[in-house]
Amino acid sequence: CNNFYASCERMFAPDLNGRPVVVLSNNDGCIIARSDEAKALGLKMGDAYFQQAAFLRQNNVAVFSSNLELYGDMSTRVMNTLKSYSPVTEVYSIDESFMDFTGINPATLRDFGLEIVQRVKKNTGIPISLGIAPTKTLAKIASKLCKQYPKLAGCCYMHRPEDIEKVLRRFPIGDVWGIGRRFEKKLLAANVATAYDFTQLSPEWVRLNMGGITALRMWKELRGEACIGFEDMPQPKQQIR
């Protein structure tokens, strides 16, 4: 889901479309969700509300306290819509899930994905980014591309090796699912700046320097080998983008 908490608030206040929106933590201490317009203003996740209050007023930013009951209800609606398209759908977090499209004609996957994006929007009002790829790690990257390139209309289907390589050559290593800040620093120190650079490392280096099997799975996934099952995925980040 795109900017999930902010999108939920907009569902019940259509006049907010096009206006910057932020959602605060339970005690109104800091920003935990931002609309694209709020991001464009330079507002960051974790910004203290009291430090940004004047700036928010000056820029006509709509500010909401967290409404977890609302977000939970909207999440259920989104996930139920997704499950109607795949019998194997695993909810990963309140605003994210993985779906298994095994058995669907690859030639129709792009149109199938667009149909899902449009149906979720119609049923719930929530915009989503759907990444389709040979592995979960690549699908996460494809989903990020949807948010960067509006012309994709919410669905990015990566399957040709040459296209995947082009994307990985431009994709920062720190943005790869499961890397984390500690490994990002280690990889940058080893001149590994992109996801593609990471795929060019030897499996021995990955195993020795990054803690064994989990990192090796990530390396294999980026190389197109599906090896992260639904039952052994990394834990999601706590904050909602």
Indicate residue ranges for each PLM-predicted region.
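Residues that scaffold, gate, or flank divalent-cation-dependent active/transport sites
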Residues: C1-I94, F98
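Short acidic, glycine/serine/threonine-rich loops at helix termini
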Residues: C8-R10, A33-D36, L138-C146, G211, ...
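Generic non-transmembrane alpha-helical segments
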Residues: R77, T81-Y85, E115-T124, K186, ...
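Short Gly/Ser/Thr- and Asp/Glu-enriched loop/turn motifs at secondary-structure junctions
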Residues: Y92-E96, A133-K136, Q235
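Catalytic palm subdomain of template-directed nucleic-acid polymerases
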Residues: M99-V117, N191
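Long, highly charged, low-complexity intrinsically disordered interaction regions
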Residues: L109-G174
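DNA-contacting surface of Y-family translesion DNA polymerases
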Residues: D175, F183-R241
